[in-house]
Structures are given as C-alpha cells and as structure tokens.
C-alpha cells in the first residue's frame, strides 16, 4: 500500500512538472503571437515608419547579434528595436542590458521595451537623427556598435548614406560596426571603399521574408 502511494505521489509530481512546462511554453507562444499582432497593427497604421510587416525572426535576430563583440567596451546602440526581438538576441549573445541604448520612434513600443528590459536605456526619438541625438545621450561613453532594424529602403538614398556615415563617425574602436538587415538582394547603402567597408552575411532563409545582414566598418 505504501509503495502504491509513493508511486502515485511521484506520478503526480511528474504530471505537475509537465503541466508547468506546457503552461510556460503556451505563455511564451501567446506572448510571441501577441507581439506579432501588435506589430502588424502598428504596421497597418504606419507602414512607412515600421517598414517590416512583422518583427524580425529569431534566426535573423541571432545573425544580427552575432556581428557584435559582447566584450567590446562601450554601448551597443539599437535603432528601431520594435518589440525587442533583436534586443533579446543581443542579451543572449552576452551584451549586458546596462550597455544597451535603444532608440525607438514608436512610443508604445518604447514603453514595452522599458518593461521588458528594465536595465537598458530606452529613448523615444528619431533614430535617423543620431548625429545630434547620440552625443547628447551617450556623452563621453564610447559606442561599440550600432545595430539597426530601420526600414532603410523606405528612405531616399542620400538619407540612407547619411545614416551610415553618421553611425560610423560615432563608433569607436577597430571592431566597431554599423549592422543593418534588409530583405533585398542588394545592400541598402552600396560599398564606398574610401569611407567604409561592407560585408554581407549568408542569407537567412528562416524568416517571414528571407533577409541578409550587412556589416559596415570604417575604412582604415
């Protein structure tokens, strides 16, 4: 009898653990679906601001984060973080929240980011104005990398070039980079060997729309 009771107790504990795991997975999936829905609603209202129809997929976010050196001194700045998919990948890469500076134009997304990443610094502002915005915010703190989820192809070519030039002028260190993704087969800003180098990663197929990551660094 005692053995049967003990077996029943173990079974109940095992079932309780399994249920907890299933509930956790369901909550996570629901949260991701809710993010997709919220992002899609914002895109429907302001398509030129968001550019993408849905948040970046995890494989693309990991590819973006892989271009960042988490040991580099200074801030990692993210432009247009949206719901924080790339932000989370950067943290998983090893970037401390305290070293993250997130610039988000949409105030609802900015509030969401503050709740999700309470130790990161979140600024509601225009990421295309980093030449004026970043020095005022970062001060003397060096910038290790700038990661961009901005929809560059929705902007004129000169504005795209200016953003890359402004970003690279703010980044310090030999390994510092401006990192951008796009769905197009060509880079959003072409190579300029006199000003910066350009490297494209392999195409990330496991995304809603296949994308590639482009890494810009100042020419030596």
Q: Where do the protein language model's features map onto the residues?
A:
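Class I SAM-dependent methyltransferase Rossmann-like catalytic core
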Residues: 32, 39-70
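Conserved class I S-adenosyl-L-methionine
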Residues: 72-82
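Conserved SAM-binding loop of SAM-dependent methyltransferases across substrates and taxa
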Residues: 83-95
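S-adenosyl-L-methionine
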Residues: 109-140
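A short SAM/SAH-binding and catalytic strip from SAM-dependent methyltransferases
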Residues: 142-159
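A short glycine-rich, Lys/Arg-flanked "PGG" loop and its adjoining helix->strand segment in the class I
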Residues: 161-174
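Conserved beta-strand signature within the Rossmann-like core of class I S-adenosyl-L-methionine
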Residues: 174-183
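Class I S-adenosyl-L-methionine
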Residues: 189-220
